[in-house]
């Protein structure tokens, strides 16, 4: 399944002044299966969800790396020391991704991986995303997207097998393994779960293959 939803959720407190405009916490890090899962950041034997959230924060803030959210539905929830203010006509939040222009083509776009962003105000002031109202930031394709979309991934019997997915639109397929990335694609700190289900917004299939390779990577 090539189309992804990369969700980043932001939990914002009420502060009298801005200590830092950059997120300072990773509350949840739950990637869907994928080729860079367990690598960005690296999972090591014994790492649980809390350890992986700490590694995700370190990767993004201290080392300047990207983290993998896997296939559709994977997400990370981060917290800020300041409130994200909606200023009309201004960009209120900046998120850096790994989109780039292909060196083999003059066409701009390259490896573009759009995502969905949701924000919430920590109205109960407990620092965790419970009982707060979440708002999806409407991007350019909001009206063309499938809302209330759902995908379930089924853990295979072997980490060497492709991972089956099924959605609530009657579609199914596989997250295929690649020879370039041989580690387990299932999040290993979630190895006790036989199924991972994600819900959210599915962006439309706008990507166009303008390459010349017979078997594009």
Language-model regions: role of each:
Residues 4-14:
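Sec-dependent N-terminal signal peptides
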Residues 19-115, 133-217:
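A domain-level signal for the mature, folded cores of soluble proteins
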Residues 128-130:
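Generic structural signal for well-ordered beta-strand positions
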Residues 118-120:
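Beta-propeller blade signature
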Residues 122, 126:
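Acidic carboxylate motifs that coordinate Ca2+ or other divalent cations, activating on Asp/Glu
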């Amino acid at each position: 399944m090539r189309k992804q939803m990369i969700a980043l959720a932001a939990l914002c407190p009420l502060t009298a002044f801005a200590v830092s405009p950059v997120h300072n916490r990773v509350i949840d890090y739950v990637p869907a299966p994928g080729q860079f899962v367990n690598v960005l950041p690296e999972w090591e034997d014994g790492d649980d969800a809390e350890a992986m959230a700490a590694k995700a924060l370190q990767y993004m803030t201290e080392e300047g790396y990207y983290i993998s959210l896997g296939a559709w539905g994977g997400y990370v929830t981060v917290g800020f020391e300041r409130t994200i203010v909606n200023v009309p006509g201004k960009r209120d939040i900046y998120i850096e991704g790994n989109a780039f222009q292909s060196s083999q083509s003059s066409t701009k776009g390259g490896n573009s991986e759009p995502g969905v962003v949701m924000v919430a105000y920590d109205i109960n002031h407990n620092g965790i995303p419970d009982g707060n109202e979440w708002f999806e930031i409407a991007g350019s394709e909001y009206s063309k997207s499938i809302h209330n979309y759902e995908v379930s991934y089924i853990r295979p019997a072997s980490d060497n097998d492709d991972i089956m997915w099924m959605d609530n639109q009657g579609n199914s397929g596989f997250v295929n393994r690649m020879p370039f990335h041989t580690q387990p694609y299932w999040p290993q700190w979630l190895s006790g779960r036989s199924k991972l289900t994600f819900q959210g917004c599915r962006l439309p299939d706008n990507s166009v293959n303008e390459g010349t390779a017979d078997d594009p990577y």
